[in-house]
Design a protein with these regions (language model features):
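Short, highly charge-biased, low-complexity peptide segments
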Residues: 244-255
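Alpha/beta enzyme core
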Residues: 3-227, 233-245
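A short, charged, Gly/Pro-tolerant segment at domain boundaries
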Residues: 255-272
Length: 272
């Protein structure tokens, strides 16, 4: 653990409240983390998709643990606010691998992780979560363990019973040691409210165009709002627009909204 890790862990945990939901604009490298921190972020969350893309890999448990953790360590060293890492399914084939990944995350100085179930059976993710919790306990670390349920995001199972299945998974994951439940892919207020009402730990949703604003989500009981890979996608879209402008019309107008060179350079030059 780093010297600042216990204080950052306590701060990060305290930020999860529906009265003022924790808003996370997910970063994928040091520069994006510094820009997001300078914009007023109380914490930095990584996006596994954005990290993978920036390192030349597709998302989906393809990136190696070593490369992912090196990036987490660099981000932690570059910012003053707490950092939580998206570690996909745990970067490994079994619970023991997940425990090793979590030990690496803690060694990097992060104070939280996201672990997703994807298409795995609920019991398998519960085992991975329990291993993650035990790994943190062995290190004497206060790790915020956020369990991601992909039933809505991936459209898994019968739509008529999807909410019931999601809640069953949430309860199982909390019993396994999860401190928070992340349900991406949900945008309608009735479902969000039902999730918040029936889940005993802080609820995290993923936001984007069409999602209620942060304050509205808080009123529904949401304690944490993430943009996921959205900021990275927007950044790459800006790069594509600039290239299409240049190669299509020979123009440069799409560069007008860029961050000024001195400002960006200063963010990466001074002390954190």
């Amino acid at each position: 653990m780093t010297i600042t890790q216990p204080a950052n862990a306590h701060l990060f945990r305290s930020l999860h409240t529906p009265a003022a939901p924790l808003a996370l604009a997910n970063a994928w490298d040091v520069a994006s983390a510094r820009v997001i921190e300078a914009a007023g972020a109380p914490a930095i969350a990584t996006t596994s998709a954005g990290v993978a893309w920036s390192l030349g890999s597709p998302d989906g448990d393809i990136l190696t643990r070593e490369r992912a953790l090196k990036l987490v360590a660099r981000i932690v060293a570059a910012v003053a606010v707490p950092v939580t890492a998206d570690i996909e399914g745990g970067y490994g084939k079994d619970a023991a691998d997940v425990a090793e990944t979590v030990a690496g995350v803690l060694a990097a100085g992060a104070v939280g992780v996201n672990i997703e179930d994807g298409t795995r059976p609920a019991a398998e993710l519960a085992s991975r979560l329990a291993a993650a919790r035990q790994s943190a306990d062995r290190a004497g670390a206060d790790l915020f363990l956020n369990a991601r349920i992909d039933t809505f995001l991936l459209g898994l199972g019968d739509p008529d019973t999807r909410l019931k299945e999601t809640l069953a998974r949430a309860h199982l994951y909390v019993e396994a040691g999860a401190d928070g439940i992340f349900v991406p892919g949900v945008t309608d207020t009735a479902t969000i409210e039902a999730l918040a009402r029936d889940i005993s730990v802080p609820l995290n949703v993923m936001a984007g165009p069409g999602t209620p604003r942060v304050a509205e989500l808080g009123a529904l009981g949401v304690a944490r709002v993430s943009l996921g890979s959205g900021v990275a996608q927007a950044a790459y879209a800006a790069a594509r627009r600039a290239a299409q402008d240049l190669f299509g019309t020979g123009g440069y107008d799409s560069l007008a909204e860029g961050i000024a060179f001195p400002e960006l350079n200063a963010l990466l030059s001074g002390p954190r």
